[in-house]
From Swiss-Prot:
It is found in: Cell outer membrane. Component of the lipopolysaccharide transport and assembly complex. Interacts with LptE and LptA. It comes from the Bacteria. This is LPS-assembly protein LptD. PANTHER family: LPS-ASSEMBLY PROTEIN, LPS-ASSEMBLY PROTEIN LPTD. Together with LptE, is involved in the assembly of lipopolysaccharide (LPS) at the surface of the outer membrane.
Amino acid sequence: MKKRIPTLLATMIATALYSQQGLAADLASQCMLGVPSYDRPLVQGDTNDLPVTINADHAKGDYPDDAVFTGSVDIMQGNSRLQADEVQLHQKEAPGQPEPVRTVDALGNVHYDDNQVILKGPKGWANLNTKDTNVWEGDYQMVGRQGRGKADLMKQRGENRYTILDNGSFTSCLPGSDTWSVVGSEIIHDREEQVAEIWNARFKVGPVPIFYSPYLQLPVGDKRRSGFLIPNAKYTTTNYFEFYLPYYWNIAPNMDATITPHYMHRRGNIMWENEFRYLSQAGAGLMELDYLPSDKVYEDEHPNDDSSRRWLFYWNHSGVMDQVWRFNVDYTKVSDPSYFNDFDNKYGSSTDGYATQKFSVGYAVQNFNATVSTKQFQVFSEQNTSSYSAEPQLDVNYYQNDVGPFDTRIYGQAVHFVNTRDDMPEATRVHLEPTINLPLSNNWGSINTEAKFLATHYQQTNLDWYNSRNTTKLDESVNRVMPQFKVDGKMVFERDMEMLAPGYTQTLEPRAQYLYVPYRDQSDIYNYDSSLLQSDYSGLFRDRTYGGLDRIASANQVTTGVTSRIYDDAAVERFNISVGQIYYFTESRTGDDNITWENDDKTGSLVWAGDTYWRISERWGLRGGIQYDTRLDNVATSNSSIEYRRDEDRLVQLNYHYASPEYIQATLPKYYSTAEQYKNGISQVGAVASRPIADRWSIVGAYYYDTNANKQADSMLGVQYSSCCYAIRVGYERKLNGWDNDKQHAVYDNAIGFNIELRGLSSNYGLGTQEMLRSNILPYQNTL
């Protein structure tokens, strides 16, 4: 299998590029061809007051009580129509009712239809006043949508809202196909609620019953309804056989939940996966609680742990109240560092190094905003679990623009850092940053002159253990004060490309920036939250080399760059390219000896960065970027991708990602950057392709190869068959799932998945390619 995936991908790429044959037809359109439509003029409003029209070969009656019609009888009122060989019409005066009760008995080849349903059988009855209708021993077919079946007795009730079946069946398969069906002693189809309720339900595949439930609900539309969703299963080398049976609970219009028992054979237990969504005045959010009571594999691998319970809690919330209050939560926590290696989860990955737990409350009015937050990290490393949390953090911004020709801003922050280890330094940091800008602009250019004053105070505690083991000592009280000055100028030139491409426009956008920040020795300040920022083209013009406030590098530098764009006659950007560099007049320093390049006195060093995008045609696109840093003496990072995308189901993408080991050491925490898997950096080439291979078959493949290790990094292959009443998806994935420090090699997981979806119950007729593309550990990202 591992050797065949690249070959299969190459075949898919070739057929996607050179096949000119379109899909035979849209699957939804094909399915609707087998569904009857209402072809008479639709009557709106109350039809009970409309006259009844009767056509027949023969008629006799006892006026006004009874009448008998025989021979091609056709009765119509509003949207309803009843046809039969013989019809008996009865009319009786009802006490207290202004209108007589009119009923119909129909015999022989009974056919009833309206704009909702068609009923056929040997015998029927109808109430012309209420539109209640009975048909015995017949079959039914929904109008304008999939859904049909048979029953001993079929009843229409509630102004055609309900179809009630006694000893009936239901399937969304088109006539001539009974691939699946549900039979029950009573079936009630509610068109308004878009649900079918079934008592003593037996689910059948063909003629074979495979599942029984005393009560079952099936959604027959796009409306939210409580009930079991379609189960699915897969096999992985991590957990062996896995089976999911999700239940959807429509709690209220503003909240719902999905409860999924997830059986894992190798773990010897059921994980309960509980997802809860809500919408309130304070915003919208999602919570997930997954719980595995015990895990026999974890017990064997971690015999010293007191508990083998495995769990995950995730909470995401975002909202605004009263237009001024803002509430945000981004919280993920798991029972142990191995959780995402052992279990697939959409809220985390085996490639993640940590989980974040952040709460924030903000207040914002014109010219002012303030946010109070707490932020913690759970590090997924058994070698180094040290991490800093901000408990709490206050951020304040005050803006006052148009103060004469100037714009002003004051930013302030106060934060207390706490470490998960008792022997690590902790600190309280207070920062104040007033800024004044002089913006000048016209229709072809702008220049912004900015001056800042950066004042930071640290009160550091718990320094004994660190100072006893390091030559550079930390001070308990540190004040750092520095000015910052920046001038940033941009121009935009534009020309028509009549000679080369009529209707197209090209721009040339040069940019130059001078930045000055004096040097301050920050070796007596511990690094609590700073890390090197990536220097892509836009990053060249940042005024900070590091994120956070603990490391503010000195700067005496000029950044220059140029961007060129090409727009078509519809003002759609077809091409852009950006190239820029930073020239350092003096070395950029912080005084931190742990930063490798600060040990070399390099003036005049350069950082180069370039980005490009080319929309070659409506179907072809190319993106790329590269950064070269003379301080690292190599290409720091680069990436490129080219994509052919005919539609969402037919695409091919080739991509390459690179990060040098020196760049990784400079940007990642030490306990990650020195890990064995990163010692040679990252160099991966990959391919992604998807394509319908027949009217109803689609295939998706992805393959990533590590050129440093000369081995596969990740691969995926998925195939889906889609019909009008069901879809079957089979997938295989081999993914990187961690690193074995004892054996010094990568750990892989092989997974085979199987999923069945009932079609015709909603408006989803997709070929499944996008779902399969997103399921990969390295999910597809659109280049166009």
